[in-house]
Amino acid sequence: MSLISAVEDRDIHNIGKTSGGGSRTSSITSSKKSLKHGSKSLRKPKVYQTTGELLSREALYKAKLKYGVYQSPAQSYSIGVSDAHAASDKAANLAHDNQTTVEAYKRMFIDPNATKAASKMGPKVVRNNSITSATSKTSKESQTKRKSKESPGAAASKAYSMTMETTSLSSQTNSRSYSITSASSVLSGASGSFNSTVNPKPKTLNLEKVLVGAEKKAESRIKERWEPEKTNFQYGVKTDEHGNLNQFSFSNEMMNNIMAKVDAPKAQDLQKVKKVSAEKEAKSMKFALGAANAVKDMHPGEDIDKSIALKAQKRETYLSQLTSQQVLTLARANVDRQLDIIEKSDMHRKLFTNMEYNKAAVAVAQSNHQKKTEFHNKINMGGGLFLSPEDITKIASGLISPVLGEVSERAEAQRAMDEEIAERTEAYNKSLNEWETMERSIISNDAKVLTTTANRHQTEKKTSQEKIKASFDALVARMDTKVAERETLLEDTKSKEIEFKKQMQQELKDEKARLDQDLEEWGKKCEQDITEARKEQEELLKPYHDDLANAEAEHKTLVEERDEINAEISRLQDAIVDHKRKISGYGNDLDAQKNRNIREDDKLLELGQTKESLESHLNDDVIILANKAKEQAELSTKEARLKQLEVDSLINERKSELNATEIELKKEKLNLLEAMKDVASARGDDKIDEEKVKKLIGMTSEEYLTQNKSVEKNVEDLPTQLEKIEEGDELKKEEIVGAETKNSGGDGVPVSTAAKEATETSSAVQTKEPEEKISIGNKSSGKEDANDCKSAEHSKEISVSQKAGNNKSLGVSPDSLEHTFSGFSQGSSIEDDQDAISNQEKK
């Protein structure tokens, strides 16, 4: 939430002029009149807290800074000049006179009237010489009386001494020593420049000071005569053209330079340096004066600084001790020497008696006269521009004559316009009078027309009423005759209507009896047609019902097979866990046997046993490895069997889904044939539309019946084929088991050869698998055991069952029943065992 409320547009010009109660204006030089005028137009801003209280000054100040509203001199509209037309000239003059320094800025905005008032309100400072006061007998009394009044002077002297230390003065001023009373006298003399009167005490007449003052006054008057000040405020910005006319002034420095034969640029540089030092000294004097004026409003009896009072007391005691005649003589000698130096340096006394000075003055006067003749009989337009009266008249004529011509043209146009306006007004008045007369005639004619039309309407009304009455009577008589005729006609039509109703009732009875007889005959005929159509429908739908029953029976068998496969899968998983446990046991035995072999090797080295005992131990190791390979082979066969059973379960599920869809399709076909049969019977047709049946089913009813008969035969032959395939599989399984038992016995056949045969049989099975189009193992790896023959034989069963299913399912391609699955990768345990056996043989 904002600290201040929104400012209205009418209050924007008042913001920044004044703050809350007791605030001062931004400018010191604004007068009382402008302040009064500004205070009337000011309006207090609406700034409140959420509780309704006014904001503090700090909050107002921060809010103004935040929103860009700041009390600055640029926003104080009461400051300025009284005449708005002279504002630009005033601003230009101030900008030309003002020096771009901080002190000049302060100096420009300090009202001299304020300093005068402050100096008048302060205590009068009495000028007193330290030497004369020391010699006088009443000096101590005057000092004791002046102690209470010296505190403002002491502060001023301190400020003056501080400024004197920082500024660079000439060697003459640096060699002098000032006392406190002399500093106060200097301040009093400076304050006299601001029209502050000094009233010294009566004392002995000092003619030297009077003569010095007269000489200075004479010098100033001569300077004013030689270099008169020319004011140039009439045409805008003040320029320095009049000051450049007399570049050589007969001052002390100029005369010294002429006598010393110094070049003009160097003399100008020296003059500038001295001018800068004089300005600095004047600034220090003004600063001291400002400090003195600043302390005048304080109590004169109170000491501002005790150290200053202590220094003044010490100096008084020191000066009281210097009352000897020697000091006075030295002081007088110094004063005389200084006066002699001043008289010698004053070259103006020799001004009119020195021929060189006169020659230089004549040369300067001639040069100035030549410069002035350039601007003779010319008017200064300001900014260094001088024009002759002829040029001014020419410029004025060039600027004013077009304006006068334009004025005359506009006056002529205005006169023509006035004449045209007068003519138009006269014509308008004439037309207005004519229109008014016409309106009056129209009104009178309208009144006459109204009366005549009213009379005519009355007469026409009477005649029309009489005509209407006569016509109405004739119409009534004519309508009465017509009504009598219509009544007679109505009686005749009523009698005819009664006779017609009787005739129609008799005809309706006869027609109803005939229709009842026809309906009975048609019902009997329809019943016969329905019985015949039902017989035909049963004959047509019999193969569909048979197919539906066969499909449901096959679905039940497939569900039973799936349950058997799931049971076999669980049994195989248990067997796989058992085999894995045995393999881990054999692995532990192998580790123990390895440790035992290591120990036996050590013992052989130590005891030197025979080769037979070593071979017997190695044969034990080989037997254990063979048992492990056997268990791993059984594990791989069980895993292959498990994968194959999973594949069988997936195929059975797919076939069950397919049978379900076929059952639904056959049901829909039966419903379709029944509906078509009903439609044909309703139409009275003996047969179904074979073309429509062919479009919907894809074949005619006769073809469909023949195809269903062949399917029934195939379904009847399927169980016998499956039994034969199962018997062949059992025989092959027994042969494989017998071979495994022979290989496991180890009599006359080493284990390594058995493992090699197993790998060969597994590779042979892999070559047969692509022929059967069922990918069971990983094609890239030839690391399968010998018992994969079982999976190959089982794949034959699957292919046979697939063929049987394809023969049963009509309208479905055999490729749609193929179920692709990712083959499982068996571990390379057999080859690892062979590698281990070969390593043992090498050892």
From Swiss-Prot:
Residue ranges with Basic residues bias: 33-44
Polar residues bias spans: 127-137, 163-174, 798-810
GO biological process: eisosome assembly
Broad class of where this protein is predominantly found: cytoplasm
Signal peptide (UniProt feature, chain positions): none
Phosphoserine modification, residue list: S2, S88, S130, S182, S401, S584, S710, S763, S775, S816, S828, S829, S838
Biased composition (Basic and acidic residues): 781-797
Pfam families per the UniProt record, alphabetical: Eisosome1
Modified residues annotated as Phosphothreonine in this record: T720
Chloroplast is among the record's keywords: no
Keyword Transferase: no
Low complexity bias: start-end ranges: 752-764
Region (Disordered) residue spans: 13-44, 120-174, 717-843
Residues passing through the membrane, by range: none
Keyword vocabulary terms for this entry: Acetylation, Cell membrane, Membrane, Phosphoprotein
One GO CC annotation: plasma membrane
Cellular compartment(s): Cytoplasmic granule; Cell membrane
Modified residues (N-acetylserine): S2
Topology class, membrane: Peripheral membrane protein
Function, as annotated: Required for normal formation of eisosomes, large cytoplasmic protein assemblies that localize to specialized domains on plasma membrane and mark the site of endocytosis.
Family that this chain belongs to: Belongs to the EIS1 family.
Name listed for the protein in its UniProt record: Eisosome protein 1
Natural source organism: Saccharomyces cerevisiae (strain RM11-1a) (Baker's yeast)
Gene (UniProt): EIS1
